[in-house]
């Protein structure tokens, strides 16, 4: 019977550690700064909504208010306008919190789409 010490082993008697290559700091930079892209697209969409499309939005709202159903001589839109103090604004054109939320959301969505499309450059998708 063989003892444990006399059994043949497959291990090397002396361990040699492989040499590691020296570490090099790798800095990954994005092609576009996300804060700049999101802020820029949101600001652009807010400006477009305020100075370009606000007149069109208000004209459509006024058209709907005159065409809508009548209750006691006044339209539903007129009745809702009497009670809506939360949408009051000091903006001369009437750009309110709903407009800011809507155009800001569109600006964010476009900004994230730009970042997503930019991140696909150089990616092997096949």
UniProtKB/Swiss-Prot annotation:
One GO biological process from the UniProt record? photosynthesis
Q: Which cysteines are joined by disulfide bonds?
A: none
- Report the membrane topology from the UniProt record: Multi-pass membrane protein
Write out the transmembrane intervals.
36-56, 97-117
UniProt transit peptide range: 1-30
Q: Does the keyword Thylakoid apply?
A: yes
Where does this polypeptide localize?
A: Plastid, Chloroplast thylakoid membrane
- What is one term from the GO cellular component aspect held by the record? chloroplast thylakoid membrane
Write out the entry's keywords from A to Z.
Chloroplast, Membrane, Photosynthesis, Photosystem I, Plastid, Thylakoid, Transit peptide, Transmembrane, Transmembrane helix
The record ties this protein, via InterPro entries, to:
PSI_PsaG, PSI_PsaG/PsaK, PSI_PsaG/PsaK_dom, PSI_PsaG/PsaK_pln
Q: What's this protein's function?
A: Not yet known.
Q: Which family is annotated?
A: Belongs to the PsaG/PsaK family.
Task: Please name the NCBIfam families in this protein's record.
Answer: PS_I_psaG_plant
Know the name of this protein? Photosystem I reaction center subunit V, chloroplastic
Q: Which gene encodes it?
A: PSAG
């Amino acid at each position: 019977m063989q003892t444990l010490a006399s059994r043949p082993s497959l291990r090397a008697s002396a361990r040699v550690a492989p040499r590691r290559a020296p570490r090099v700091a790798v800095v990954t930079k994005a092609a576009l700064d996300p804060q700049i892209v999101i802020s820029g697209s949101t600001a652009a969409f807010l400006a477009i909504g305020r100075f370009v499309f606000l007149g069109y939005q208000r004209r459509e709202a006024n058209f709907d208010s005159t065409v809508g159903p009548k209750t006691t001589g006044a339209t539903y839109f007129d009745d809702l306008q009497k009670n809506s103090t939360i949408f009051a604004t000091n903006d001369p054109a009437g750009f309110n919190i709903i407009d800011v939320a809507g155009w800001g959301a569109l600006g964010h969505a476009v900004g994230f789409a730009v970042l997503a499309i930019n991140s696909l450059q150089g990616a092997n998708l096949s």
